[in-house]
Amino acid sequence: MLGNPVGVISSSDSQSLERFLNLGYPLSAIDVQRTMAVCAEDGAAAVILALDEETLRKDALQSVSVDVLACDDNGLSDAEVAKLVAKFGCAVGKQTRIAGRTQESDLLAAQAATAYGQTDSRSLSLSIAMVLAAGVRKANIKSALRVSRDLN
């Protein structure tokens, strides 16, 4: 994601860096731990998890530390987001950041989407909001988007 090596765990597309993972869904807590270990061994700096019933079983994130939660529904409060993810065993602590799309992330995503010829930039905007919440500077995000565009 934006220049950092990441893993993705989602029922629609799980991968460790560039390698696709063949997993049986929904994942249990042990499955999540095993998959995250594979991602770490491959050199992933972070793992993006889809928090939905198709991907995860109840309490599948019991021993997982979550730094950033993102929700595409900007109408939800932080407390409502925390309640929604609690069924997966995800504890929202003082260090957890809850991110949602913002005007800033929408603008950056729209600029990048135009360069790629895409019309929908919502998922990119949410990704940008997540890395902003994680503490990545806006200049670094712009640079990563530029490099990504140049590589494509």
Regions found by a protein language model. Name each.
Residues A133-N152:
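Gly/charged, well-structured mid-domain segments that form the phosphate/adenylate-handling core
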Residues D120-S123:
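Hydrophobic alpha-helical transmembrane segments
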Residues M1-A110, G117, I128-A134, L151:
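Phosphate-binding loop of NTP-binding sites
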